[in-house]
Amino acid sequence: MKAQTTSKDSLILRQEVVGARRPSNYFWAVIVSIGGLGFLLAGLSSYLKVNLLLVSDTSALQFIPQGVALLFYGTAGTLLAIYLWLSLLWNVGGGYNEFNKETGKVKIFRWGYPGKNRRIDLDWPLEDAQAVRAEVREGLNPKRELFLRIKQRRDIPLTRVGDPMSLSELENQGAELARFLEIPLEGL
């Protein structure tokens, strides 16, 4: 999440939030695509008794049970790859957090899956912001997130989902946001 202050007299703070378009997601989409397509072609080769792969000859495999298993895993892998590529295309989870002192609004925007809730656009008055809360949990599944506490609402997550940010980055962004909004920073 990159924070950049824009507009005259630093009255607008806009933080971009990276969604599904992270390098690790591109890597996994390519790997799963290659693996799923390879298994699918190997299963089809054993059924059709024609070699469809460039790297090995799987047409000699028995269709039952090896070919069926390859076909099943290939279909599952290909469907997972399609899901990953569509998530990347739609940039699910991407968006921005905008804190605007000119209009007195907090705006949280995220992209979702196509349908009724494709655009997730939340607005609150700036004076309803009570605090910036940092949540840090270490261990096997570490969690480092920033939340905005809003009056009479649940805490709103501000950071990206996925790989946790460094503790210093979390502190800096939390302190910058708390300073900009002139509210306390909790949890550190």
UniProtKB/Swiss-Prot annotation:
Key words of the record: Membrane, Photosynthesis, Thylakoid, Transmembrane, Transmembrane helix
Membrane-related topology note: Multi-pass membrane protein
A biological process from GO: photosynthesis
Residues passing through the membrane, by range: 26-46, 70-90
GO cellular component: photosystem I; plasma membrane-derived thylakoid membrane
Domain of life: Bacteria
Pfam families in UniProt: Ycf4 (PF02392)
Record's keyword annotation contains NADP: no
Xref: InterPro entries: PSI_Ycf4_assembly
Subcellular location field: Cellular thylakoid membrane
Family statement drawn from the similarity comment of this UniProt entry: Belongs to the Ycf4 family.
Job of this protein: Seems to be required for the assembly of the photosystem I complex.
Protein's name in the database: Photosystem I assembly protein Ycf4
